[in-house]
């Protein structure tokens, strides 16, 4: 693939060198050319910082670090849009949208950083900072029960399916005493979706992966998207009664 500067809804358009088809970066799909309608698989990815990744994966086998590309004139140590880590007057924090949009969705601040997720053909944009503040957020995408958990070691939001075993009601989770607990059994879970203590020890949840985007770009490309926070989030009142956990429906 390569980019020649063309944009659609303020999002990069890619060209594959084999057929010349045009691809949407945010959809991961060809929208024009011989491969029109062809999609790419999403691979697991976390947008984190090097210092966190280095610590978490230090002891892991088969970990590779990509080398900075050589040649050319691009400085890969400098972000041309400023720094998303430092509050101030830069592209990550101000209201500028440099290129035209077909629509601007007002449900979130345009520069809100979201994880855009598709589950069973339902789309949802998840506010990463909302998950960071709440620690644990139970929600639905269509009829699929999900939970977003803040992984403090990587400083990322991770999304899991709350259906642990077939035939049983989906679990509900809460943040209590600095730990992730399911409210039915009070078992303790980690941010990797694994139960590490209690009646459900050894159980695990399936993780879902999406794409990282600004809200304005995700919503412009996917106007039918739901949101977190929003109506899909399980209310806090439902988390106060363990015997009601299996009765919470979208």
What is each model feature region?
Residues 1-250:
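Mid-to-C-terminal functional-domain signal that highlights helix-capping/loop sites
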């Amino acid at each position: 693939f390569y980019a020649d500067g063309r944009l659609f809804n303020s999002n990069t358009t890619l060209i594959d060198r084999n057929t010349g088809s045009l691809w949407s970066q945010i959809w991961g799909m060809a929208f024009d050319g011989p491969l029109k309608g062809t999609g790419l698989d999403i691979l697991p990815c976390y947008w984190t910082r090097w210092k966190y990744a280095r610590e978490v994966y230090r002891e892991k086998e088969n970990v590779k670090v990509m080398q900075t590309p050589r040649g050319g004139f691009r400085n890969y140590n400098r972000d041309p849009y400023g720094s998303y880590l430092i509050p101030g007057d830069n592209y990550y924090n101000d209201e500028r949208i440099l290129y035209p949009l077909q629509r601007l969705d007002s449900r979130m601040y345009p520069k809100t950083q979201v994880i855009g997720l598709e589950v069973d053909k339902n789309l949802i944009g998840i506010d990463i900072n909302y998950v960071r503040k709440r620690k644990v957020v139970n929600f639905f995408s269509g009829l699929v029960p999900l939970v977003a958990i803040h992984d403090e070691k990587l400083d990322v939001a991770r999304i899991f399916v709350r259906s642990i075993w077939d035939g049983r009601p989906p679990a509900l989770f809460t943040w209590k005493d600095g730990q992730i607990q399911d409210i039915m059994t009070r078992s303790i879970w980690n941010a990797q979706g694994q139960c590490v203590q209690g009646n459900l020890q050894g159980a695990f949840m399936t993780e879902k992966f999406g794409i990282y985007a600004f809200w304005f770009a995700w919503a412009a490309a996917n106007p039918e998207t739901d949101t977190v926070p929003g109506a899909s989030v399980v209310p806090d009142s439902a988390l106060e009664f363990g015997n009601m956990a299996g009765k919470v429906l979208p």
